[in-house]
């Protein structure tokens, strides 16, 4: 069996309320455990509409048919009215996920992190993480041991800002395999587990059409020479394309692919991991900068 980390990002109120329960049902039917990363503060995702002036973002929204994919309640959330508190309004759903799956922090305010983390001082970065962490721990009633920043907006500043939270791992960037981020003076930070595979919205309309996506993704998994990690979104695979995701899980099992929580991808001895840095870069199918893996050593 080829092991693939399954990361589920939950960005919005509706994704939490409607998408997560559907995903829990599907994963239960297939006997799969995954890593859920929750946004728990205000749902202000509609404020991303200003990015429509950017050609790359406009094209992404058009080719992914964003209005029918996400729904207008998501696309307008937090614009004409204050964003609803995601965690406080969906505590039972989040606790249900935590009963059977690994649960980590995605963001306090997904929109704000994606829009402003690149210029925030380190103290503000740490404050945002702490605010979300305290809320998520209050909801599930136990320590949170992992995190994955919104939109992969991470660099070495973010790596350092998160060091005080003693996470087992972070999944803040795109890359090929788990690595130890190098800090100053020869020390290393919390393990990073990068996402290696394209997401639905990155691939559909550019590399493949909707009908061919499952086959495309499975072929990417078979070709992945590193440690495969796949990200889905509760707003996509948990709502509009839940049936397609169900088919993907069936096809994956038939092809000897086993999805698992990200923590199961870590070796027993972290000294075996390569060292590296999280640097800013770009990725086909995604607008703006994001964190990319830059390996410095190959590991054991």
UniProtKB/Swiss-Prot annotation:
**A single GO CC term, please?**
membrane
Q: Report the enzyme's class at the first EC level.
A: hydrolase
NodB homology domain location, by residue?
2-260
Q: Which UniProt keywords apply?
A: Antibiotic resistance, Hydrolase, Lipid A biosynthesis, Lipid biosynthesis, Lipid metabolism, Lipopolysaccharide biosynthesis
**Pathway it acts in?**
Glycolipid biosynthesis; 4-amino-4-deoxy-alpha-L-arabinose undecaprenyl phosphate biosynthesis; 4-amino-4-deoxy-alpha-L-arabinose undecaprenyl phosphate from UDP-4-deoxy-4-formamido-beta-L-arabinose and undecaprenyl phosphate: step 2/2; Bacterial outer membrane biogenesis; lipopolysaccharide biosynthesis
Q: What is its EC number?
A: 3.5.1.n3
**GO:BP terms for this protein?**
4-amino-4-deoxy-alpha-L-arabinopyranosyl undecaprenyl phosphate biosynthetic process; lipid A biosynthetic process; lipopolysaccharide biosynthetic process; response to antibiotic
Q: Which GO terms describe its molecular function?
A: hydrolase activity, acting on carbon-nitrogen (but not peptide) bonds, in linear amides
Catalyses: 4-deoxy-4-formamido-alpha-L-arabinopyranosyl di-trans,octa-cis-undecaprenyl phosphate + H2O = 4-amino-4-deoxy-alpha-L-arabinopyranosyl di-trans,octa-cis-undecaprenyl phosphate + formate
The family database entries (NCBIfam families) matched by this protein are listed as: PRK15394.1
Annotated function: Catalyzes the deformylation of 4-deoxy-4-formamido-L-arabinose-phosphoundecaprenol to 4-amino-4-deoxy-L-arabinose-phosphoundecaprenol. The modified arabinose is attached to lipid A and is required for resistance to polymyxin and cationic antimicrobial peptides.
* HAMAP family (alphabetical): ArnD (MF_01870)
Instruction: Tell me the protein family, please.
Output: Belongs to the polysaccharide deacetylase family. ArnD deformylase subfamily.
| Annotated protein name in UniProt | Probable 4-deoxy-4-formamido-L-arabinose-phosphoundecaprenol deformylase ArnD
Q: Which gene encodes it?
A: arnD
